[in-house]
Amino acid sequence: MAQDQNHLIWLDMEMTGLQPDSDRIIEIAIVITDSQLNTVAEAPVIAVHQPDSVLDAMDEWNRNTHGKSGLTDRVKASLIGEADAEAQMLAFLQQHVPAHTSPMCGNSICQDRRFMARYMPHLEAWFHYRNLDVSTLKELAKRWRPEVYKGVEKKGKHEALADIRESIAELRHYRDNFLRLVP
């Protein structure tokens, strides 16, 4: 498939916590959409291997959430480290989107970008410096149009691919119910 500079790269990662200095990436997923938010391609979801010492250091919320979803077991069983995960995701992106053209898209995406800058810097460098953060619209709708904000249904599975799909659906909801698109 040819690269398209108008495609959007949606990314989500699950981490062992919120601090890039001490926590690590344990799952990564990427979805490519066209500019109208239609899915073009999905990368294989990667559980990123981390040693037991990293997993044992997770706080209770992360232990429970990632344990219940099965992610902790998938991370332990994975043979793919951070460098290999980064290389696989870069190879996927090179098929679909030219470097430096797509903003990093997602929900609270700056958090993912912080981890990526530290642990997957080549992947982070593929993106445009801008972010398309759905949480910005969420915060505005919450304050300006609460009925639109309340219309978003989220399951909050904290699984990378499911979270991306929810973010895309959420942006569609805001596009259709909050933003006025005049031709």
UniProtKB/Swiss-Prot annotation:
Question: What molecular function terms (GO) are annotated for this protein?
Answer: 3'-5'-RNA exonuclease activity; nucleic acid binding
Q: Which UniProt keywords apply?
A: Cytoplasm, Exonuclease, Hydrolase, Nuclease
* Exonuclease domain mapped to chain residues: 8-171
One GO-annotated biological process of the protein? DNA metabolic process
- Localisation: Cytoplasm
Sorted alphabetically, the Gene Ontology cellular component annotations on this record are: cytoplasm
EC number(s) given by UniProt: 3.1.15.-
Highest taxon above the source species: Bacteria
Q: Its principal location?
A: cytoplasm
Pfam families per record: RNase_T
Function (record text): 3'-to-5' exoribonuclease specific for small oligoribonucleotides.
Protein family: Belongs to the oligoribonuclease family.
Supply the name of the protein: Oligoribonuclease
